[in-house]
Regions:
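PAPS-dependent sulfotransferase catalytic core
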Residues: 1-26, 210-211, 225, 232, ...
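Histidine (H) residue identity feature
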Residues: 10-13, 18, 24, 49, ...
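A broad structural signal for alpha-helix termini and local helix breaks/kinks
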Residues: 5-6, 118-119, 182
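Compositionally biased, intrinsically disordered low-complexity regions enriched in proline and serine
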Residues: 6, 11-12, 74, 80, ...
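PAPS-dependent sulfotransferase catalytic domain
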Residues: 26-127, 136-149
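Short, charged N-terminal helix-start/capping segments
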Residues: 16-43, 209-221
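PAPS-dependent sulfotransferases, especially Golgi type II membrane carbohydrate sulfotransferases
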Residues: 122-236
Length: 236
């Protein structure tokens, strides 16, 4: 986004939403997936525009972070929590949901959807030319495993990690309701590919379960961040 659209300011790597600063009328673009959980509480900011990239949760939970290839990054618990926060915003005037699969298969069509939704964004380069112009921080290079052309090579990679899917469903229950709701499957028939597959018990960076005390602590911390953001933006 910061490469292909004109911005007044951006950050070298992911930054928490409440720490972002900008001058009046500045276009500032940030990216931090976990900030999805805060968006329902700040979407009333008339100058906040949200793009939610939805991806097949099976592919999400088999991703590994560039820093630690031995461990899976996310899990179904976290995906469900974040998606539940995004779901109520579908249809909001300043919210746009984009499928990751559409983005990597047709980046320029996806870019056109973004400019149609938010026409004040000024395009500098095509998404398909991103890799020719991108200048990213070292942290981002590590996380993304360097700058590469946008391509669909990561779509459907869950099929190479069936043991991971088996283990996640054993812990969190069937993903079929999630997949049907998001339009990735029409029934539970896909689960037949898991028959006889041994569970992959490799760990996740994020915990599979959160205890009550942690949930309370996280909510208190969230309210603090939301209050800071609203105070900065002078929201009631």
């Amino acid at each position: 986004m910061v490469t292909c659209f004109r911005t007044n300011k951006h950050y070298d790597h992911e930054i928490r939403f409440h720490l972002v600063t900008a001058k009046h009328n500045d276009v500032v673009i940030t990216k931090r997936p976990k900030d999805t959980m805060y968006m329902p509480d700040v979407i009333d900011d008339p100058n906040l525009y949200v793009i939610y990239v939805m991806r097949d949760p099976r592919d999400v939970i088999v991703s590994r972070h560039g820093k630690n290839r031995e461990m899976y990054y996310s899990n179904i618990r976290l995906w469900r929590e974040l998606h539940a926060c995004a779901r109520p915003l579908f249809g909001h005037d300043r919210f746009l949901c984009i499928r990751y699969e559409d983005f990597v298969n047709n980046p320029d069509v996806t870019q056109s959807r973004i400019t149609a939704k938010f026409p004040w964004l000024e395009k500098q380069y095509k998404f398909s030319e991103y890799h020719q112009h991108a200048q990213v921080s070292e942290k981002s290079k590590v996380a993304m495993r360097n700058v590469r052309p946008i391509a669909p090579s990561s779509v459907g990679v869950w099929r190479k990690h069936l043991g991971r899917i088996v283990e996640q469903q054993a812990i969190h229950g069937s993903m079929t309701p999630d997949l049907v709701d998001c339009g990735y499957e029409s029934s539970s028939n896909w689960e037949t590919v898991l028959d006889g597959v041994l569970a992959d018990k490799s760990g996740s960076l994020y915990p599979e379960k959160t205890h009550l005390w942690l949930k309370i602590s996280q909510r208190v911390n969230a309210l603090r961040k939301i209050a800071i953001y609203r105070r900065k933006r002078r929201l009631a």
